[in-house]
């Protein structure tokens, strides 16, 4: 039984908390971009920055989904790696965009595809976990009942 007052497993607690913190940071970065950076950046730079914020928000929410799935089905190496890769994707993809917008060398843009691949792998691992017929808990019961 989980040792958390809300009954959350360690994976669920970490993923939901990290996702919420990354969402908070995404809101702050989005507001900063809309108010402080709008006059400083070209329209293309601002669009790129906003893409970084959007991807951060989407994948922070994805990280929270990983935590919820882990709470329902139990943790697995696939879920743990999905969470790690969501975070890595945010750091590499969104982080490189933020840094380039702040004036970092354009060569840093070569890091962004690593973030994109991390995002894709994270979603694939989450799908694999959910579709796995060997899951315990609710998903396993549904598979045994033909659902």
For the regions a language model picked out, list residue spans one by one.
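Juxtamembrane helix-break-helix junctions at the cytosolic face
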Residues: 67-79, 101-105
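Interfacial helix-loop-helix junctions of multi-pass membrane proteins
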Residues: 34-49, 95-117
């Amino acid at each position: 039984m989980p040792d958390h007052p809300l009954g959350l497993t360690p994976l669920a607690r970490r993923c939901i908390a990290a996702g919420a913190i990354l969402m908070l940071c995404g809101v702050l970065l989005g507001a900063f971009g809309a108010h402080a950076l709008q006059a400083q950046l070209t329209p293309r730079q601002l669009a790129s920055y906003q893409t970084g914020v959007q991807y951060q928000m989407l994948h922070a929410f994805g990280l929270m989904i990983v935590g919820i799935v882990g709470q329902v089905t139990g943790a697995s190496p696939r879920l743990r790696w999905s969470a790690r890769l969501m975070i890595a994707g945010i750091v590499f993809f969104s982080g490189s965009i933020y840094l380039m917008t702040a004036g970092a060398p354009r060569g840093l843009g070569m890091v962004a595809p690593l973030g994109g691949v991390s995002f894709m792998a994270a979603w694939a691992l989450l799908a694999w976990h959910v579709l796995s017929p060997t899951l315990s808990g609710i998903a396993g019961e549904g598979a045994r009942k033909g659902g």
